[in-house]
Design a protein with these regions (language model features):
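ATP-binding N-terminal substructure of ATP-dependent carboxylate-amine bond-forming enzymes
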Residues: 1-93, 97-100, 118-121
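Short glycine-/small-residue-rich flexible loop motifs, especially phosphate/cofactor-binding loops
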Residues: 47, 99, 124, 240, ...
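Short aromatic/hydrophobic-glycine micro-motifs
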Residues: 54-56, 107, 132, 169, ...
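Active-site nucleotide/adenylate-binding loops and adjacent lid/helix of ATP-dependent enzymes
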Residues: 68, 74-78, 83-235, 282-287
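Hydrophobic faces of well-ordered beta-strands that scaffold small-molecule active sites
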Residues: 136, 171, 301-303, 322
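A long amphipathic alpha-helix within ATP-dependent nucleotide-binding catalytic cores
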Residues: 163, 167, 217-311
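Active-site "cap" helix and flanking loop/linker of ATP-utilizing ligase/carboxylase catalytic domains
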Residues: 207-246, 250, 340-364
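C-terminal active-site "lid" helix and adjoining low-complexity regulatory extension at the edge
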Residues: 270-283, 294-300, 307-364
């Protein structure tokens, strides 16, 4: 007989609990303020890019901006542009599909397994078979929501699956690959920029709990605005698992000066966690990233690579291509510890050159 936690009714209660937490998070005032900062960030970067080439810009509503230069025009909405086709977005949010496409082109990807909440045993069998830490995540979507790392057993799988299911019924579990996350940004197969993205961390003051340290960090982010971070640190299963691996909980009071890593999922990180990496990534990895973009068939994409050594090929280092993202975030390219890569400044001339020219009015 399974322990109580393994019973379907209890699993459903866990899922409902996570749904309530997410509903509360969405309605919080600080969440709305963070979203407003994100909107401001994109509005300002497109206006700056337009001004640098003498283009005009007109808000059309719903955060859509129309940018004109001579007879050419293009439209953008935050990090969505005119070259981001609906079908491309639909494909790239489907992580198992992207994994299959990359595997067909013999690119390095992590072993994975698709499942639903009714197939927990299937996911547990996969975790047992790989005999190492795994990652549970929604099979569709992005932004790091519902992703839990460090999953090692049945109880972990159940909790992580309940958390992931808040964001979609189709789930996946994959082998967790050791190493750092590198975001490679491509346009038509050419590398634009590469960023080493470290996970969020806080430095203990010797008197505050980890929960309080997270609160203080989020307060700093809200006061500083989008120049520091475009998201708040969400306390989720990944935070709890990452702390547990360090022998900590949210109630722990670490010694002064100790750096506490908060998450392995890097989507909530800040400017202080991003480092320029174009000079670190070897030619082989850059070529693999371009091949991944071509395999999926997209034009502007952010490719996430995990590797312990970016200076050698992925197959040698044991690294993988994790995801191919359309409508990639620009924030970590603009805001790094050691400089900035203004994506919109480089991208806008391309968008205008590849736009449809304004039609001339017909003469009756």
């Amino acid at each position: 007989m399974y322990p109580l936690i393994y019973r379907p009714g209890v699993i459903k209660m866990l899922y409902l609990g996570y749904r309530l937490k997410e509903a509360y998070r969405v309605r919080r005032a600080d969440t709305h303020l963070a979203l407003a900062y994100r909107s401001k960030f994109y509005n300002e970067l497109w206006r700056d890019a337009a001004s640098q080439i003498g283009a005009s810009i007109e808000p059309l509503g719903n955060e859509i901006l129309e940018i004109r230069l001579g007879q050419n025009r293009t439209r953008v909405q935050q990090n969505t542009t005119s070259i981001d086709r609906v079908i491309d977005v639909a494909m790239t949010v489907n992580k198992p599909l992207v994994h299959r496409l990359l595997a067909e082109h013999r690119l390095q990807t992590p072993a994975c397994c698709e499942f639903t909440m009714n197939e927990i045993a299937k996911a547990v069998a996969f975790v047992d078979s790989v005999a190492t830490k795994c990652v549970v995540k929604p099979a569709n979507g992005g932004g790091g929501r519902g992703v839990t790392t460090g999953v090692t057993g049945r109880l972990d799988v159940i909790r992580a699956a309940a958390s992931a299911a808040v964001y979609g019924s189709d789930l996946m579990v994959e082998r967790q690959v050791p190493g750092d996350v590198y975001r490679l940004l491509y346009l038509d197969g050419a590398l634009m920029d590469a960023v080493l993205r470290k996970p969020s961390a806080v430095v203990a003051d010797g008197k505050s709990t980890v929960r309080e340290l997270i609160h203080f960090e989020n307060e700093v982010r809200l006061k500083t605005g989008p120049n520091l971070a475009h998201a708040l640190i969400l306390i989720d299963m990944d935070v709890r698992r990452t702390l547990s691996n360090q022998g900590l909980t949210l109630s722990s009071v670490p010694k002064e000066g100790v750096e506490v890593v908060l998450k392995q999922v890097i989507n909530d990180n800040s400017r202080n966690d991003n480092v320029s990496a174009s000079h670190l990534v070897c030619k082989s990895i850059i070529e693999d990233g371009a091949a991944a973009v071509a395999a999926v068939g997209v034009r502007l994409a952010g490719v996430d690579v995990i590797t312990p050594d970016p200076g050698i090929p992925l197959a040698e280092a044991g690294g993988v291509i994790l995801e191919v993202n359309t409508t990639p975030s620009y924030h970590h390219h603009y805001y790094k510890r050691d400089g900035s890569y203004p994506v919109a400044v480089h991208l806008l001339p391309f968008l205008l050159a590849n736009s449809v020219a304004e039609p001339h009015p017909s003469v009756a």
